[in-house]
């Protein structure tokens, strides 16, 4: 037997075969953008449980992707309301705090450089009177025009 006639099996038996088949990631299979494999690795490495099922990282990736999309959509709306093209932490804070469900979910979270929600205590606002509601028919007296002051010599 000649050693050169044997096929080497170091590459999984495909050494002389055709082109390699394109790999399909679990993220692509699930139709997700978030990395299913990386999340699965983190679940295993974090020792949250002895074993991690095959569906757990897919489900978690889908949930995280949904939450990220929701926050980014609301933050994009906040940026557009402020006539800006770029989302900054302030827009993220406004989006999260103005949304009831996200505000409840992220109640204990501090967003760096987010600031605070604008809020004025109603007691400090000027009181509405009856005169402001009804239009007064009396014209206001015009202000006297200020003439030129005489030049000082």
Swiss-Prot record:
> What is said about the domains?
Contains one SPKK motif which may interact with the minor groove of A/T-rich DNA sites. Phosphorylation of this motif may regulate DNA binding. This motif is reiterated in both termini of histone H1 and in the N-terminus of sea urchin histones H2B, but its presence in the C-terminus seems to be unique to plant H2A.
Q: At the top level of its lineage, which domain of life is listed? A: Eukaryota
- Name the SUPFAM superfamilies for this protein: Histone-fold
What protein name applies here?
A: Probable histone H2A.2
Q: Does the keyword Nucleus apply?
A: yes
Q: Does the keyword DNA-binding apply?
A: yes
- Feature: compositional bias, Basic residues: 142-153
Tell me where it mainly resides.
nucleus
Q: Which GO terms describe its cellular component?
A: nucleosome; nucleus
User: What does the similarity note say?
Assistant: Belongs to the histone H2A family.
Q: Which PANTHER family match?
A: HISTONE H2A
The protein's matches in InterPro entries, at most eight in alphabetical order, are given as: Histone-fold, Histone_H2A, Histone_H2A/H2B/H3, Histone_H2A_C, Histone_H2A_CS
> Native species of this protein?
Medicago truncatula
Q: Name one GO molecular function term.
A: structural constituent of chromatin
């Amino acid at each position: 037997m000649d050693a050169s006639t044997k096929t080497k099996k170091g590459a999984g038996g495909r050494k002389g075969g055709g082109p390699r088949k394109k790999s399909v990631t679990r993220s692509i299979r699930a139709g997700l953008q978030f990395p299913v494999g990386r999340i699965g690795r983190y679940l295993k490495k974090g020792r949250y449980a002895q074993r991690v099922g095959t569906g757990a990282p897919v489900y978690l990736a889908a949930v995280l992707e949904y939450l990220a999309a929701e926050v980014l959509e609301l933050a994009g709306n906040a940026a557009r309301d402020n006539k800006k093209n770029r989302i900054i932490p302030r827009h993220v804070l406004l989006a999260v705090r103005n949304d009831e469900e996200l505000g409840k979910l992220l109640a204990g979270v501090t967003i760096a450089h987010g600031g605070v929600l604008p809020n004025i205590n109603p007691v400090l606002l000027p009181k509405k009177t009856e005169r402001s509601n009804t239009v007064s028919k009396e014209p206001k007296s015009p202000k006297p025009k200020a003439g030129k002051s005489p030049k000082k010599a």
